[in-house]
UniProtKB/Swiss-Prot annotation:
Signal peptide: none annotated. Its EC number is 2.4.2.9. Catalyzes the conversion of uracil and 5-phospho-alpha-D-ribose 1-diphosphate (PRPP) to UMP and diphosphate. Allosterically activated by GTP. The keyword Cytoplasm does not apply. This is Uracil phosphoribosyltransferase. It catalyses: UMP + diphosphate = 5-phospho-alpha-D-ribose 1-diphosphate + uracil. GO terms for biological process: UMP salvage; uracil salvage. Pathway: Pyrimidine metabolism; UMP biosynthesis via salvage pathway; UMP from uracil: step 1/1. The gene is upp. PANTHER family: ADENINE PHOSPHORIBOSYLTRANSFERASE, URACIL PHOSPHORIBOSYLTRANSFERASE, CHLOROPLASTIC.
């Protein structure tokens, strides 16, 4: 599995701000979108382009455009919504597929409860977004759904990832690509990433 920890100074700085314990909901939400945007920049760096001729201000001019690669953004509810706008800044014409999966706090197992995928997902590259890759259960379940629907090109974008989650994802889906702002130390006894970000969903939506 291709694993990319984005080490750009802007990514590290913004992620560091997000780790503040008393960060406001507004600021956390803004930064989640901004880091999501920067991760998208990295994840789409290998998109193929083609040369086309357009009418410029002084006559015909040859330019490069992305070569027919359709994209769907797949936020995992609910926290993934906090990164979605940042992704769409770079790919505004992308279609949106939504997957709802929550983690049982006792068993730590993923529980699917909703999915709405674009009809031609087999023709698209999926950018799956979720702030945290902890145990990997929710991400693996989401990718299972996408593959069952025919999607074969999948990239995962997360703010922070635990080594345990990375290992689980690689074992289940070695063909996907992972882009993260940080590989953190690991999980605590409750299955939360350390140092992590706390509960990203609560911080994005202002709930507890």
């Amino acid at each position: 599995m291709k694993i990319v920890e984005v080490k750009h100074p802007l990514v590290k700085h913004k992620l560091g701000l997000m780790r503040e314990h008393d960060i406001s909901t507004k600021r956390f939400r803004e930064l989640a979108s901004e880091v999501g945007s920067l991760l998208t920049y990295e994840a789409t760096a290998d998109l193929a382009t083609e040369k086309v001729t357009i009418e410029g201000w002084n006559g015909p001019v040859e330019v490069e455009q992305i070569k027919g690669k359709k994209i769907t953004v797949v936020p995992i509810l609910r926290a993934g919504l906090g990164m979605m706008e940042g992704v769409l800044e770079h790919v505004p014409s992308a279609r949106i597929s939504v997957v709802g999966i929550y983690r049982n706090e006792e068993t730590l197992e993923p529980v699917p409860y909703f999915q709405k995928l674009v009809s031609n997902i087999d023709e698209r590259m999926a950018l799956v977004v979720d702030p945290m890759l902890a145990t990997g259960g929710s991400m693996i379940a989401t990718i299972d759904l996408l593959k069952n629907a025919g999607c074969t090109s999948i990239k995962v974008l997360v703010l922070v990832a635990a080594p345990e989650g990375i290992a689980a994802l690689e074992k289940a889906h070695p063909d996907v690509e992972l882009y993260t702002a940080s590989v953190d130390k690991g999980l605590n006894e409750h299955g939360y990433i350390i140092p992590g970000l706390g509960d990203a969903g609560d911080k994005i939506f202002g709930t507890k």
